[in-house]
């Protein structure tokens, strides 16, 4: 959520800043802006519209400059309007953008008012701008005239999670950035330097990347950087050559990124499984062979779609590996009393590796005495990967659409391999069963292609869903989390209220909602619970509900009055959830398209939730 781009150069940097914002649009935003220093003055453009409109505004006002910052805002403090949009100015001296939340901003605001500062916005960001102005300009300030030192002094007073970028009107050679809980990277080019929330923002412009650590403050000049760490010591940070691909933010032949990413899943799974020859601990890092045999239980922490992948993994870990597993919503875990088990493996799951609630839960678990940690993540350079003992990197590639698709299925593949690795270590996986599982995993990409071929039938269903405002999703056992994920997808991009229940819970409440106007989506694999599920289907039919069933071919569930069936290509045993979630993604996508919603940027949602 939110995006920062900053630059100091010898050329007009506005086109690069705005292109950077365009590449960060996937993170979610409701306003955007850009500021530069030109002819000794601060100038800016802001809008509550899209980045394309900001570009038009900047061009029409002939905005240009060799130093600048830009921002996409996702409102937290203050409604989405131009006054609250970033960049914020303090006087005619300081320009600043900020991601995150300053928790003690009200106290700081009152202090600033008491010494004469006025506020134009309702944001916590303006407080930071004024604090830096005070440190940079006041005659009595020990850091007067030194922007790097001023920012280092100010961040010590801030409570919360943030990333900032700031420059001063009278110093057109320096941009300063700081991060605490929100990601920020530096990119170094030829006689120019950049700050960004994501290296993708400057892909193709600069490829020498520095990933700032927690608590770092950085001074950028055209020649390079100086970094001060959380203890205010000047330190060196490793420079890595990273080839981020700008093509990741191009649609190609697809209408939306979500559609593109749904159809990229066979490739994403193939890449994630590449080189897997068996289920050995070293899949999860060099220390895994030492750590995993000591583990007697698993604690999974995640949010949103990643939480549902964790719920699916619980079934695998307990049924295949016979290891007790607990799954917690990360935002809840850290605020309740728990009984820590030092022999548990804490598994954190996140596409970005920067999800604030999950990172906070990980840190809380470590404070409680959990020493064994594993990240399932799609970004190798993320905070989550850096802060865990073990890791498995999915290779989904950049995911732009807010509604996660390929990240989810690759997470499932990683978690399935974790279950099989534990099973092998604990003596529950024979060599023959390991070979069968490997063959199934290798066949997954082609099996997914067969599922994607069902799209025309799913489009026909979506036309009926377009006219509905509510939907129920049903699943049993291993496929209940898949029903939850299907309901989440439908509600977040089509704005249809959708809820998922274990099918056996119908008679305990949800059946009261079933009418002819209530579509009921059911996931029906040919597993041990099939006959129970068929009984639940009959309960819905008896109340006049309209059933939409994704059924394995050998279930003998037939389309008839009140029930429509799409046949899945094949039954895939324990891996069936990876196949069954894909038609639910397609159903949500085509329903949203038919309803005319903004599929890739649904209202009020952000891709990477980097504030609590």
UniProtKB/Swiss-Prot annotation:
Xref: Pfam families: GATase_6, SIS
Q: Which top-level enzyme class is recorded in the Swiss-Prot or TrEMBL entry?
A: transferase
The main location is cytoplasm
**Entry superkingdom:** Bacteria
SIS domain: which residues?
288-428, 461-602
Q: What is its EC number?
A: 2.6.1.16
Q: Where in the cell is it found?
A: Cytoplasm
Keywords on record = Aminotransferase, Cytoplasm, Glutamine amidotransferase, Repeat, Transferase
Q: Please list the disulfide bridges.
A: none
Catalytic activity line of the entry:
D-fructose 6-phosphate + L-glutamine = D-glucosamine 6-phosphate + L-glutamate
CDD domains from the UniProt entry: GFAT (cd00714), SIS_GlmS_GlmD_1 (cd05008), SIS_GlmS_GlmD_2 (cd05009)
Q: Which GO terms describe its molecular function?
A: carbohydrate derivative binding; glutamine-fructose-6-phosphate transaminase (isomerizing) activity
User: Which residue intervals define the domain Glutamine amidotransferase type-2 in the entry?
Assistant: 2-223
The catalytic site is made up of: 2, 607
Q: Name one GO cellular component term.
A: cytosol
Sorted alphabetically, the Gene Ontology BP terms of this entry are:
carbohydrate metabolic process; fructose 6-phosphate metabolic process; protein N-linked glycosylation; UDP-N-acetylglucosamine metabolic process
Function of the protein: Catalyzes the first step in hexosamine metabolism, converting fructose-6P into glucosamine-6P using glutamine as a nitrogen source.
Subunit comment: Homodimer.
Quote the NCBIfam families the UniProt record gives: glmS (TIGR01135), PRK00331.1 (NF001484)
Question: Mind telling me what this protein is named?
Answer: Glutamine--fructose-6-phosphate aminotransferase [isomerizing]
């Amino acid at each position: 959520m939110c995006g920062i781009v900053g630059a100091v150069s010898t050329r007009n940097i506005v086109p690069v800043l705005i292109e950077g914002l365009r590449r960060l649009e996937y993170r979610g935003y409701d306003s955007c802006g850009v500021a530069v220093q030109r002819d000794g003055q601060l100038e800016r453009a802001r809008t509550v519209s899209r980045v394309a409109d900001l570009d038009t505004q900047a061009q029409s006002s002939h905005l240009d400059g060799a130093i600048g910052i830009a921002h996409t805002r996702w409102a937290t403090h203050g409604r989405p309007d131009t006054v609250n949009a970033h960049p914020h100015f303090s006087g005619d001296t300081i320009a600043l953008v900020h991601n995150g939340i300053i928790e003690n901003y009200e106290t700081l605001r009152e202090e600033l008012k008491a010494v004469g500062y006025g506020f134009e916005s309702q944001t916590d960001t303006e407080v930071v701008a004024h604090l830096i102005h005070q440190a940079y300009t006041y005659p009595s300030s020990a850091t007067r005239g030194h922007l790097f030192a001023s920012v280092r002094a100010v961040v010590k007073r801030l409570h919360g999670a943030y990333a900032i970028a700031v420059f001063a009107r009278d110093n057109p050679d320096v941009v300063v950035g700081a991060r605490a809980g929100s990601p920020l990277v530096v990119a170094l080019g030829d006689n120019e330097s950049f700050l960004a929330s994501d290296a993708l923002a400057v892909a193709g412009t600069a490829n020498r990347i520095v990933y700032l650590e927690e608590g770092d403050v950085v001074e950028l000049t055209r020649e390079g950087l100086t970094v001060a760490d959380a203890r205010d010591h000047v330190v060196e940070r490793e420079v890595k050559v990273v080839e981020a691909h700008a093509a990741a933010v191009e649609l190609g032949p697809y209408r939306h990124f979500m559609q593109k990413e749904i159809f990229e899943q066979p490739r994403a799974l193939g890449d994630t499984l590449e080189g897997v020859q068996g289920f050995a601990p070293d899949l999860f890092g060099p220390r895994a062979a030492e750590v995993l045999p000591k583990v007697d239980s698993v604690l999974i922490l995640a949010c949103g779609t990643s939480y549902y992948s964790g719920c699916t993994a619980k079934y695998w870990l307990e049924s295949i590996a016979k290891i007790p597993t607990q799954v917690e919503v990360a935002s809840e875990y850290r605020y309740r009393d728990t009984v820590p088990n030092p022999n548990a493996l804490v598994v954190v799951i996140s596409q970005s590796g920067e999800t604030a609630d999950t990172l906070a839960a990980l840190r809380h678990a470590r404070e409680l005495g959990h020493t064994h940690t594993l990240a399932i993540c799609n970004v190798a350079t993320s905070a989550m990967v850096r802060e865990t003992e073990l890791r498995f990197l999915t290779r989904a590639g950049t995911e732009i659409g807010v509604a996660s698709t390929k990240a989810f299925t690759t997470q499932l593949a990683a978690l399935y391999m974790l279950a099989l690795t534990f099973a092998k270590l604990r003596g529950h996986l024979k060599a023959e069963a390991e070979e069968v599982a490997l063959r199934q995993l290798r066949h997954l990409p082609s099996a997914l292609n067969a599922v994607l071929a069902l799209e025309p039938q799913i489009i026909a269903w979506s036309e009926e869903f377009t006219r509905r405002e509510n939907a129920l999703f049903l699943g049993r056992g291993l496929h209940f989390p898949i029903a939850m994920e299907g309901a989440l997808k439908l509600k977040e991009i089509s704005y249809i209220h959708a809820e998922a229940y274990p099918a056996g819970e119908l008679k305990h409440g949800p059946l009261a909602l079933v009418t002819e106007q209530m579509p009921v989506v059911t996931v029906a694999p040919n597993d041990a619970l099939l006959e129970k599920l068929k009984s639940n289907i009959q309960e819905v039919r008896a109340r006049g509900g309209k059933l939409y069933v994704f059924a394995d071919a050998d279930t003998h569930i037939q389309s008839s009055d009140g029930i429509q069936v799409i046949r899945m290509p094949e039954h895939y045993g324990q891996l069936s959830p990876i196949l069954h979630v894909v038609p639910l993604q397609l159903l949500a996508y085509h329903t949203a398209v038919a309803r005319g919603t903004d599929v890739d940027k649904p209202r009020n949602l952000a891709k990477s939730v980097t504030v609590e």
